[in-house]
C-alpha cells in the first residue's frame, strides 16, 4: 500500500476508535434522543381468577404498592390507582414491584401499548386452593382470639374486618377462637377449621395457655413452636396462607401470678416463633412487639390475660399490617408466568 494511502487508512481507523461519528453543532458527540412519552394511568387489582381481566366481581384494589411501566415507577394510592406522567411510547410491560406487594401476592405483569387509550388494569395474584374462598380470613386461636375481655365479645375481629374493607374493598372474617385451648389443641383442629371455613388466610394466635402446662415451663420450649409450625404447614396444605401472631404479654400488674416470670417466658418463646416463621416463610403479626411499644401495658388489659377494647384494637392493627405489607426480605422475582396481554376496557379475548 502506498505511504499516503496507508496514512489516510490509519487516520480513519483512529477516528473511528476515538468515537468518530455523528457530532453535535458544537463539535461533540450528539446525545441519543429521548423517546417520546405519554401519560399512563390505571389501577392495581386482585385478579382472583387469574385471567388477567378486572372482572366485575373483583373489587379488591391494592394501595401503597409500587408499579413499573417502561422503566417509570409510581406508587398506588386509594383504590389502587396510579398515574405515571411520561412512559415511553410503544410496547411496554406493566407490573407491580414484588418487594412492595402484600405478603404472598405476585404480579405476572401485563403487556400494554403506550399510549394505551384508557386505564391500565394491572393484576396481582394470590395462589389459593381450589376450594378456598378469596378474601375470607380465619381468626384461629384461644380465648384471646374468641374476644374475651372486649365489650362486644368480638375481640379484634370486627375492627380488622372494617380496616381491610376500607383499605382493600372486601373482607369477611370467621372467628374460631376456642377458649382455654393450648397450641397442641390448635394443631389438632386447624385442618378441620380451614376445611369448614374455606378461608384464604389463617390468623394463628396460640401459645398463651401453654404456660399452664408444667412441661412448658420446665422443658422449654416444649411443644409450642412445633405445634405452630404444624399449623403453618397445615394452612398451606389447605391452599391458604398463614399469618402467625406473636404471643401477647400478660398484665404486669398481677405480680401475685408470676407476671414477670411469665412475660420472660413469653419473650423467649416469641423469639423462637419468629425464627420458625422466617424458616417457613410465613408472615408475622407482631402482637407482642406492638403491645410493648405502648406507654402503659396495664392500660391494654381487661384482666391478667385478656386485652380490653384498647388492646384488641392494637391487635387488629398488628394483623392488618401483617396482611397488607410485604413479607420481610421479599424476593424481587415475579410470578413465573410471562406478561399477559392487556385487553382494553369493554373487550374480551
Report each predicted region and the residues it spans:
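A short, solvent-exposed beta-strand micro-motif common in secreted/extracellular proteins
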Residues: 88-103
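A short, amphipathic beta-strand motif
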Residues: 40-46, 80
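Catalytic His-Asp segment of secreted/periplasmic serine-dependent ester chemistry enzymes
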Residues: 249-349
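Active-site segments of SGNH/GDSL-like serine hydrolases
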Residues: 205-209, 232-267
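Short, acidic Ser/Thr/Gly-rich low-complexity loop/linker segments typical of extracellular
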Residues: 53-54, 61, 68-81
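Structured interaction patches on ligand/partner-binding surfaces of diverse proteins
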Residues: 99-123
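Oxyanion-hole/transition-state-stabilizing segment in secreted/luminal serine hydrolases
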Residues: 160, 184-225, 248-250
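Serine-esterase "nucleophile elbow" of acetyl-processing enzymes
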Residues: 126-177, 191-198
Amino acid at each position: 500500500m502506498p505511504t499516503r494511502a496507508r496514512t489516510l487508512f490509519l487516520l480513519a481507523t483512529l477516528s473511528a476508535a476515538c468515537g468518530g461519528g455523528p457530532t453535535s453543532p458544537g463539535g461533540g458527540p450528539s446525545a441519543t434522543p429521548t423517546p417520546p412519552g405519554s401519560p399512563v394511568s390505571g389501577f392495581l387489582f386482585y385478579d382472583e381468577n387469574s385471567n388477567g381481566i378486572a372482572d366485575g366481581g373483583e373489587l379488591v384494589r391494592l394501595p401503597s404498592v409500587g408499579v413499573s411501566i417502561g422503566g417509570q415507577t409510581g406508587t398506588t394510592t386509594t383504590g389502587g390507582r396510579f398515574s405515571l406522567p411520561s412512559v415511553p411510547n410503544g410496547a411496554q410491560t406493566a407490573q407491580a414491584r414484588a418487594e412492595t406487594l402484600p405478603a404472598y401476592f405476585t404480579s405476572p405483569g401485563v403487556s400494554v401499548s403506550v399510549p394505551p387509550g384508557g386505564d391500565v388494569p394491572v393484576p396481582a395474584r394470590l395462589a389459593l386452593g381450589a376450594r378456598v374462598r378469596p378474601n375470607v380470613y380465619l381468626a384461629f386461636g384461644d380465648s384471646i382470639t374468641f374476644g374475651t375481655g372486649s365489650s362486644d365479645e368480638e375481640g379484634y375481629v370486627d375492627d380488622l374486618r372494617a380496616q381491610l374493607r376500607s383499605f382493600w374493598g372486601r373482607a369477611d372474617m370467621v372467628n374460631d377462637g376456642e377458649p382455654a385451648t393450648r397450641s397442641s389443641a390448635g394443631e389438632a383442629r386447624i385442618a378441620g377449621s380451614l376445611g369448614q371455613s374455606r378461608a384464604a388466610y389463617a390468623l394463628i394466635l396460640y401459645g398463651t395457655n401453654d404456660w399452664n402446662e408444667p412441661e412448658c415451663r420446665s422443658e422449654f420450649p416444649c411443644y409450642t413452636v412445633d405445634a405452630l409450625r404444624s399449623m403453618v404447614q397445615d394452612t398451606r396444605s389447605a391452599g391458604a396462607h398463614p399469618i402467625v401472631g406473636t404471643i401477647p404479654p400478660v398484665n404486669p400488674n398481677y405480680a401475685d401470678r408470676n407476671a414477670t416470670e411469665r412475660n420472660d417466658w413469653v419473650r423467649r418463646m416469641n423469639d423462637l416463633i419468629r425464627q420458625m416463621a422466617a424458616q417457613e416463610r410465613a408472615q408475622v403479626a407482631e402482637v407482642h412487639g406492638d403491645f410493648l411499644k405502648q406507654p402503659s401495658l396495664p392500660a391494654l388489659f381487661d384482666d391478667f390475660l385478656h386485652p380490653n377494647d384498647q388492646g384488641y384494637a392494637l391487635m387488629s392493627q398488628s394483623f392488618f399490617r401483617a396482611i397488607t405489607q410485604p413479607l420481610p426480605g421479599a424476593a424481587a422475582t415475579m410470578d413465573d408466568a410471562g406478561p399477559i396481554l392487556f385487553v382494553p376496557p369493554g373487550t374480551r379475548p
